[in-house]
Regions:
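Electropositive, gly/pro-rich neighborhoods at or near active sites that engage anionic ligands
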Residues: 43-201
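Anaerobic metallocofactor- and corrinoid-dependent redox/one-carbon enzyme cores
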Residues: 2-32, 36-37, 41-45, 55, ...
Length: 532
């Protein structure tokens, strides 16, 4: 492909075909996209160097996970940071195979991979390898967060190498398809690992009402997904007269007992990631980005953007691994916050939201739920979940939830919930009809609930009165979708648009074997799903 860049990994890619110009829709420059390709090629070279090894060292695994996470949409816009990551990958390979560069008869077995080979491959091969690549990029984010809390899984670590190796190897459709589904299988283990890490570190999430009001005085907004960063910031700001507000996917942090004990963790600011340039405009407070989703900041708040971990933006102050948040704290005190309390609302006018309905909380009411289904009080369950985004038409999910029947339960997770999480849908048998299960990785919890219900009724998950209505934007949504396919979940509705990296043949395979379908209208989809 003779283009300035090529990237089609997110839902908003140009024309649902790919970003090829001077910059992507996400805001990354063509040079940045090329560096991401170079980084991916270097990671494949590292995977080639460890091919056949019985064990993967902790340092190698950490480099691979960090490198993959760096290439996720809206994580790093900083060319220097990506170049440093490339050098880190090459240094790790040099440590493993130090004699390769000196070899007089190079075999090429540990060479870096030229990503142009992938982008110019047969469209079906390209499609399957893209599913693998984007899936392990998303999975790397979950592995990274688990690693931060000192949890890891040797099988997960080995699979990153296995998958990268296959991307750089000549494979047929027949041999790639099982690997695509294996991404889903291993991601289930990875999400289980992160669920264990979060709950054993911070406690089991509890249903918790969260205010959207911002109190007067200095405050800090924390966005992203990393609970450890939030914990450290809460500890460092305690007693300093600074309030902390979550943003986006950090909202579920309010449900964890260890984090709830901090009285200055006050509430949630704003809605989903794509609204940040409007919501952060002239914000009298700093914003700490712990992971994606970062958008190029406007000049009105660029001086108060702080990044950490793999997140990076040129000119933004980066908090290194020492985790000294003093610059963020000083900026909060300097800006001073609002002069008076600010009453803010969600998209639908609600002044509070509720989170914390993880699998443990829901399954503690399993008998009530089962009895409600048997009595007819609950006729259907909908999992309306996934990423939010800026493309027009995502109000579909708001309208869908509003129109769900009064005898149905809506489970949700990830940032797509901000389209409707401030709605009051009422209750059934003392349980709220709308239950927020947490971050995108808490799809693991939704799966646990589905499996438990299937066991209770002696049927398969596909035989339950349960429908999956998903929204996607970036690569974590890809690995979750592959997990659902690995589990044999059928008749998933997916939107807002279908992935550009699905070739017609691969899409047809998913339709024929799994019943995947694009969303249409809320009315038509609810009718079809209720009658399925």
């Amino acid at each position: 492909m003779d283009k300035k860049m090529f990237c089609y990994q997110c839902e908003q890619t140009v024309g649902c075909t790919g970003c090829t110009g001077n910059a992507g829709v996400c805001g990354k420059k063509a040079a940045t996209a090329k560096l991401q390709d170079e980084l991916t090629g270097a990671l494949i070279g590292l995977a080639r160097a460890v091919d056949g090894a019985e064990t993967i060292s902790k340092s190698t695994s950490q480099v691979i996970i960090e490198g993959l996470f760096t290439t996720v949409t809206n994580v790093s816009f900083d060319d220097a940071a990506i170049e440093n990551m490339i050098q880190k990958v090459r240094a790790e390979k040099e440590r493993l195979v130090p004699d390769c560069n000196k070899c007089q008869s190079p075999c090429g077995k540990s060479d870096e991979y030229d990503m142009q080979q992938l982008w110019n491959a047969d469209e079906d091969i390209r499609s399957l390898k893209s599913l693998i690549l984007f899936g392990i990029r998303g999975m790397a984010a979950y592995a990274y967060h688990a690693n931060v809390l000192n949890y890891e899984d040797a099988e997960v670590n080995r699979f990153f190498c296995e998958a990268l190796f296959k991307i750089g190897y000549e494979e047929s459709m027949e041999t790639l398809l099982p690997t695509v589904l294996k991404v889903g299988e291993i991601n289930l283990k990875c999400m289980a690992l992160l669920d264990k890490a979060n709950t054993e570190t911070y406690g089991t999430p509890e249903p918790t009402a969260v205010t959207l009001t911002v109190e007067k005085g200095p405050f800090i907004v924390v966005t992203g997904h990393d609970l450890k960063d939030l914990q450290l910031l809460l500890e460092q700001t305690e007693g300093k007269g600074i309030n902390i507000y979550t943003h986006g996917e950090m909202l579920p942090a309010h449900a964890y007992p260890l984090l709830k004990k901090f009285s200055h963790l006050k509430g949630n600011f704003g809605t989903a990631w794509q609204n940040q340039q409007k919501e952060f405009d002239h914000l009298p407070a700093p914003i700490l980005y712990t992971t994606n989703c970062l958008m190029p900041p406007k000049s009105s708040y660029a001086d108060r953007v702080f990044t950490t971990e793999v997140v990076a933006f040129p000119g933004a102050v980066h908090i290194d691994e020492k985790k000294d948040f003093t610059p963020v704290i000083e900026k909060a005190l300097e800006l001073g916050g609002y002069k008076e309390d600010q009453t803010r609302t969600g998209i639908n006018g609600g002044t509070k939201v509720t989170t914390g309905f993880g699998h443990a909380a829901i399954l503690s009411h399993a008998d009530t739920v089962v009895e409600a289904v048997k009595s007819g009080a609950i006729r259907h369950f909908f999992l309306v979940a996934g990423c939010d985004g800026a493309k027009p038409g995502r109000n579909y999910y708001t309208e869908f939830v509003k129109q769900t029947p009064s005898d149905s339960i809506v489970l949700t997770l990830a940032c797509g919930k901000f389209r409707f999480n401030d709605l009051d849908l009422g209750e059934i048998g003392g349980l709220p009809r709308l239950m927020d299960m947490g971050q995108c990785n808490d799809a693991y919890g939704a799966i646990q609930v589905a499996v438990a219900l299937a066991d209770a009724f002696g049927c398969s998950v596909n035989e339950l009165p349960l429908s999956f209505v998903l929204s996607w934007y970036e690569q974590k949504a890809v690995c979750i979708l592959l997990t659902l396919l690995h589990l044999g979940i059928k008749n998933i509705r997916l939107g807002l648009s279908l992935p550009a990296f699905l070739s017609p043949n691969i899409l047809n395979y998913l339709v024929e074997n799994y019943g995947i379908a694009p969303i249409t209208t809320p009315e038509e989809d609810i009718k079809a799903l209720m009658n399925h």
